[in-house]
């Protein structure tokens, strides 16, 4: 997803939801941190994962999905979409809320996207462990976008993680 597409999806999510702040927890959160071209592993994604703080039951997430989500008229028209999610979708290190990165441009029309900080994002993706997440994490490491010591510290901040998953993530940190 290109930056202009990301801005459009954020603007559309704010309009559909009637809010001026959204939370971005997927790979497109990189737009708040990486200036310029995203790694191919992030740019090829056609969805932005959008949540609204406090929407634990997912009612607003469902509204996003139905209005501008996958297979919607928005998706058919523009070729990208917003995926409605809830905060608990991502497993994150303690304190992540205090590290969110603000993204707002004139093109978001007053809607602020609070995006995961890149190390918190990396940890979340590494824990998810799907092939596309592992590729994403490796690309960030190769490009020097993340710092290994910071990743190690963030992993320690993840509570109640299955020891096998923790071990796998530790391996991804030390050998990107």
Task: Map each language-model feature to its residues.
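Compositionally biased terminal segments of proteins
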Residues: 1-176
């Amino acid at each position: 997803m290109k930056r202009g597409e990301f801005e459009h999806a954020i603007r559309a999510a704010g309009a559909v939801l009637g809010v001026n702040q959204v939370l971005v927890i997927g790979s497109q959160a990189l737009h708040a941190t990486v200036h310029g071209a995203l790694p191919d592993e992030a740019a090829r994604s056609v969805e932005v994962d959008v949540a609204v703080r406090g929407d634990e039951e997912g009612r607003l997430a469902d509204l996003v999905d139905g209005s501008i989500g996958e297979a919607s008229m928005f998706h058919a028209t523009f070729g990208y979409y917003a995926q409605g999610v809830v905060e608990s979708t991502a497993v994150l290190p303690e304190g992540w809320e205090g590290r969110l990165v603000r993204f707002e441009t004139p093109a978001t029309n007053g809607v602020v996207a609070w995006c995961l900080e890149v190390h918190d994002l990396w940890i979340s993706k590494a824990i998810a462990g799907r092939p596309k997440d592992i590729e994403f994490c490796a690309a960030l490491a190769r490009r020097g976008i993340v710092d290994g010591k910071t990743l190690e510290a963030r992993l320690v901040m993840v509570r109640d993680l299955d020891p096998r998953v923790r071990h796998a993530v530790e391996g991804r940190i030390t050998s990107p």
